[in-house]
């Protein structure tokens, strides 16, 4: 009988833990990802748009983790354009901000200027986030056009080409 309060307390704790466990959410979750085919379609469309404008570029689509999913470099695009395109996509997805906007927000003596010194950050236009159903699912990076704005326009053309495949 002396252990009755202890046993009662143990039962209450066990019951509480069981109830909490029953209400706990799963330890996993589902995420949206671009298919490789959709990523390649966006890359091709951006490359074609830049070609029509007379630009030789590299284009990369990165997934939601910033890992390259699809990549193309046109014949005469400089060797630096490959890593720059990937890093523009990485910067856009990492900071959830298109790089043209990011470049303005981190320029000069702003409090965020130091972020430009982080590895892989490319604070010039040409990195644009890709969203589906309100969720960022990746980003496209373009490098090699004569201006950041031109890189950005080609990236947006790549996204426009896959718009029907994304949930908006």
How should these model regions be labeled?
Residues 23-168:
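Flexible, solvent-exposed loop/hinge segments and secondary-structure transition points
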Residues 19-21:
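N-terminal signal peptide c-region/cleavage motif recognized by signal peptidases
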């Amino acid at each position: 009988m002396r252990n009755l309060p202890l046993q009662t307390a143990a039962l209450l704790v066990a019951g509480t833990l069981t109830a909490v466990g029953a209400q706990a959410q799963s330890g996993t979750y589902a995420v949206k990802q671009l298919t490789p085919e959709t990523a390649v379609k966006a890359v091709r469309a951006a490359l074609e748009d830049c070609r029509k404008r007379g630009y030789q570029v590299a284009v990369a689509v990165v997934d939601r983790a910033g890992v390259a999913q699809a990549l193309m470099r046109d014949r005469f695009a400089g060797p630096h354009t490959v890593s720059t395109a990937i890093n523009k996509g990485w910067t856009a997805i990492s900071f959830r901000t298109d790089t043209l906007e990011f470049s303005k927000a981190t320029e000069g003596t702003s409090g965020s200027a130091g972020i430009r010194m982080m590895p892989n950050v490319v604070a010039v236009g040409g990195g644009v986030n890709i969203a589906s159903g309100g969720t960022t699912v990746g980003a496209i990076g373009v490098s090699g056009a004569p201006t950041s704005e031109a890189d950005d326009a080609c990236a947006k053309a790549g996204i426009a080409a896959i718009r029907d495949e994304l949930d908006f």
